[in-house]
Design a protein with these regions (language model features):
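Active-site helical microenvironments for divalent-metal-assisted chemistry
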Residues: 2-218
């Protein structure tokens, strides 16, 4: 994770699971009914405990559940939905790659790591470009999860703009235009890899709204 961090002891149960995960909101019924998804939800809740999104101020857990929900409602398989729940757990949360593989297996772990940024790249634009290429090379399943993630990200940014107005850029540490450029490049990569992506229409509609906001500021 980027920036200064402090290691604090966390309360765990006899299995080494973070007890704070039990304080998270109950998962949606469709997640709770699947042992695999329920386990992934608990891991995500632990990894993102107390985290909030810079864009809209919502609990970070809401974002990963939104990504998983988009995938589930579009009819994608349980493996993809599971990776959707955990896609930020290593990059932005406290879950290690080793524990992820141990708890969820190689397939889900590989998908999550394909969606994880290289935080050794300091430049925002270069880091995002490297991520897009990494996802592209990882194949259609990773690209699909990435598309759902971008749709949730843009939704969150638009909610943040509605809530915080021009303060949103200070909260994010970058400009709305910079984020829109990344999202546009992401959509181009998604459509080059998967010309008929189920998420393309919604992504284009949300990008148009961001463009209107950016244009109105200049």
């Amino acid at each position: 994770m980027r920036g200064l961090s402090v290691s604090l002891a966390r309360p765990t149960d006899e299995f080494g699971h973070d007890r704070r995960a039990s304080e998270a909101p109950a998962p949606p019924t469709w997640i709770a009914q699947s042992p695999v998804l329920a386990r992934a939800y608990r891991l995500a809740a632990s990894a993102h405990a107390s985290q909030r999104r810079a864009t809209d101020g919502a609990p970070f857990l809401d974002h990963v559940v939104e990504v998983a929900t988009l995938l589930e409602e579009a009819g994608f398989d349980e493996e993809s939905v599971t990776a959707g729940l955990l896609h930020d757990a290593v990059e932005r949360g406290t879950l290690t790659a080793e524990r992820l593989r141990r708890e969820m297996g190689d397939a889900v772990s590989s998908l999550v790591l394909a969606l994880t940024e290289d935080d050794s790249i300091d430049s925002f634009a270069e880091r995002k470009a490297a991520l897009r290429e990494q996802v592209r090379q990882s194949g259609p399943q990773a690209v699909t999860i990435f598309a759902a993630d971008k749709l949730s990200d843009i939704n969150g940014l638009r909610r943040g703009i509605a809530r915080f107005g021009d303060e949103i850029e200070q909260r994010m540490g970058t400009t709305v235009g910079g984020m829109a450029s990344h999202y546009r490049a992401s959509v181009e990569m998604i459509e080059a890899s998967m010309p008929r992506s189920v998420f393309s229409p919604a992504l284009h509609a949300q990008l148009e709204e961001l463009d209107r906001y950016a244009a109105a500021r200049h």
